[in-house]
Amino acid sequence: MMKNILAIQSHVVYGHAGNSAAEFPMRRLGANVWPLNTVQFSNHTQYGKWTGCVMPPSHLTEIVQGIAAIDKLHTCDAVLSGYLGSAEQGEHILGIVRQVKAANPQAKYFCDPVMGHPEKGCIVAPGVAEFHVRHGLPASDIIAPNLVELEILCEHAVNNVEEAVLAARELIEQGPQIVLVKHLARAGYSRDRFEMLLVTADEVWHISRPLVDFGMRQPVGVGDVTSGLLLVKLLQGATLQEALEHVTAAVYEIMVTTKAMQEYELQVVAAQDRIAKPEHYFSATKL
């Protein structure tokens, strides 16, 4: 059975971020994606200028009520949330999660708590970080912070892999069953590798791949793709190890393709066959 994922995050008309980055790769792995956009911008904000609007929070709820009205909400296997335009949008998303789980008790909530970036600092509207700490985290089944976001969620510094595992376990005590630390950055074993951790109450998997050097301008949307692909693989029944290995390789293929084409925006269409069947392989290690 093909899995259906309600993906609630940002949308850009030009380029790739949020749903505009993750939607196609998720579909390429064989999932039905229902994109619901928290913002519609001309382009992502790292360009320094953009046009567009943040969707009214009630818009999100209205759209989902429309899906419920045609009796399709029970076919939703998971809700994925990413970039929020406001804390109030977050409250509406949690209402949507409750509504989906009422229609399908097996449905999962994957929260990508987009708040900041090791190089960019905090990048969200006031109140969003507090929303994730107080409400998003306890409501989630799976949560996928980067290092900055992990520190915000656990409310203390994380300096190495061991501390990252302990911090992830602190989050698990508050709600989620799975924590993906999607960029260990300075807390990783090696400064010249891209490292991730996948943590549950009784398992820890670590993986690393080469960093792809884009100089001063790192492509946007890598985390969005990572979260979306991990959710698809887990819904399709992959083990933690299998999911982590496939996602790491698929994202690496996108990065290598983007670099080879000398582009700044993620080249998800050009890399599509290697998203489905990566040519590289990176082995996850159980810690």
From Swiss-Prot:
Residue pairs linked by disulfide bridges in the UniProt entry: none
Taxonomy, superkingdom: Bacteria
Membrane among keywords: no
Record-linked SUPFAM superfamilies: Ribokinase-like (SSF53613)
One MF annotation (Gene Ontology) recorded for this entry: ATP binding
Annotated binding of substrate, by residue: 10, 45-46, 224
Cellular component GO terms held in the UniProt record: cytosol
Keywords linked to the UniProt accession: ATP-binding, Kinase, Magnesium, Nucleotide-binding, Transferase
Keyword Transmembrane helix: no
Self-association and partners: Homodimer.
UniProt xrefs under HAMAP family: PdxY (MF_01639)
Protein family (similarity comment): Belongs to the pyridoxine kinase family. PdxY subfamily.
Protein name: Pyridoxal kinase PdxY
UniProt source species: Shigella flexneri
